[in-house]
Amino acid sequence: MTITINNYNNDKKNLILGLTGSVATIKAKLLVEQLIQHFNLIVIPTETSLKFLSDQDFEFISSKCKIYKDKDEWENVDLLKRSALHIDLRNWANSILISPCSANTLGKISNGLCDNLLTSLIRAWDYKNKSMILAPAMNTMMWENPFTFKHIETLKSISPNVFIIDPIEKKLFCGDIGMGAMEQVPKIVDFTINNLK
């Protein structure tokens, strides 16, 4: 399988938006609304992220851009053409934005694990020529955990094309007040525009 971009405006750059299992995924519709003004967009939600998307939001997103889920990786394997979806996605994209990036996904990708479509794409990413932008979102204690610091430092050490959009302090979904909320959507979009490879 090779990804076609016939439905896209080819003067725009190609961006993949990864959604992960954080409650901040409820902002995905707003993020997509703003990103599609600037980029050709493909969305890759993890299975856990889908629990935070309403049916209406999923329908809206799928009406604006292509969505690839974990099952698509295996349904589209073409051994004769020696094609894999995560490789086709990497070849298509100029950049990837993972927003929100959960503690779980952050830990996986910083340790090279690749057990779903999104993390397989990250494992095969071209860090020399393409940017990867992460917008973490998690509980304050998870954000302040020493493992989180190590994971972020590991990713930053891979390439100057890896960017972290630090979370902000506010009242979190769990009721705690502290650092860990995903940055505001307009700031994430602006950062992505300015740091796209």
Swiss-Prot record:
Cofactor: FMN
Protein origin, superkingdom: Eukaryota
Sequence positions that bind substrate: 139
SUPFAM superfamilies cross-referenced by the UniProt entry: Homo-oligomeric flavin-containing Cys decarboxylases, HFCD
GO biological process: coenzyme A biosynthetic process
Pathway in which the depicted protein is active: Cofactor biosynthesis; coenzyme A biosynthesis; CoA from (R)-pantothenate: step 3/5
Pfam families found in the cross-reference section: Flavoprotein
Binding site for FMN: 52, 102-105
Cofactor note: Binds 1 FMN per subunit.
GO cellular component, as recorded: phosphopantothenoylcysteine decarboxylase complex
Gene3D superfamilies assigned: Flavin prenyltransferase-like
GO molecular function: FMN binding; phosphopantothenoylcysteine decarboxylase activity
Enzyme's top EC category: lyase
EC number: 4.1.1.36
The reaction(s) this protein catalyses: N-[(R)-4-phosphopantothenoyl]-L-cysteine + H(+) = (R)-4'-phosphopantetheine + CO2
Keyword annotations from UniProtKB, A to Z: Coenzyme A biosynthesis, Decarboxylase, Flavoprotein, FMN, Lyase
UniProt-listed InterPro entries: Flavin_trans-like, Flavoprotein
Positions of transmembrane segments: none
Subunit structure: Homotrimer.
Cross-referenced PANTHER family: HOMO-OLIGOMERIC FLAVIN CONTAINING CYS DECARBOXYLASE FAMILY, PHOSPHOPANTOTHENOYLCYSTEINE DECARBOXYLASE
Task of the protein: Necessary for the biosynthesis of coenzyme A. Catalyzes the decarboxylation of 4-phosphopantothenoylcysteine to form 4'-phosphopantotheine.
Record-given protein name: Putative phosphopantothenoylcysteine decarboxylase
Organism of origin: Dictyostelium discoideum
Gene behind this protein: ppcdc
